[in-house]
Amino acid sequence: MYGKVETDGTETERTVSGVTSETTNASKSENYIGGSVFAETEYAGFTLGLDVVPFKIKLGDGKRTDTTSDANESTQEDGTVSAEASLDYLTTIYAHYPIGDWYAGLGYHMTKVTTDEKLHTSSYGNQDINGLQYAIGKNSGSLRYELSYSDFDDISLTSSNGDKITADADNLMFKLSYVYGQ
């Protein structure tokens, strides 16, 4: 599989000592190559399946250096901070509707957004999210070619000190599969 994850996000830092909070927007695009394992069965003309990606898909990362203009501020948060987010062990339940050698597919994703950050005074947790996958593919003997688009739930994380991150992730993927027993 080869894919591209597009993530748009906003970080809103908390209000400190009457100073208005700061908002930072960012967009990240990450390409990935990987694989998955799947099992499927046929039922009433449909193909029903379960697909698991047994690795992390990186959503994005970033670094920033903060400096304060007044050494007398009550919260000195100078220095470099970094953060990274990934989708862990993406699991998809799907159905394919055959149209000759072609098929249309619909899938339901389940995954966890995991964060790894080095911040001044706080940390973010992780969040379970879901998503929908829309696919079109072609079966050719034991090979399957598929193009899919996935739209994930919005991500909303609040740090231990009240900062907030919101993000939206979408995925476009091409997948070549070998179907055993076809």
Which residues fall in each region the model found?
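Membrane-embedded beta-strands of outer-membrane beta-barrel proteins
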Residues: 35-37, 93-95, 134-136, 145, ...
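Transmembrane beta-strands of outer-membrane beta-barrel pores
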Residues: 2-6, 43-45, 52-58, 99-101, ...
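Transmembrane beta-barrel outer-membrane domains
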Residues: 26-34, 82-90, 117, 123-131, ...
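Helix-adjacent hinge/juxtasegments
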Residues: 68-101
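Outer-membrane beta-barrel transmembrane strands
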Residues: 28, 33-40, 51, 94, ...
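Outer-membrane beta-barrel "beta-signal"
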Residues: 136-142, 168-182
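Outer-membrane beta-barrel translocator domains and adjoining extracellular loop/strand segments
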Residues: 6-23, 59-72, 109-126, 150-166
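Outer-envelope beta-barrel architecture signal
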Residues: 44-46, 91, 100-102, 132, ...
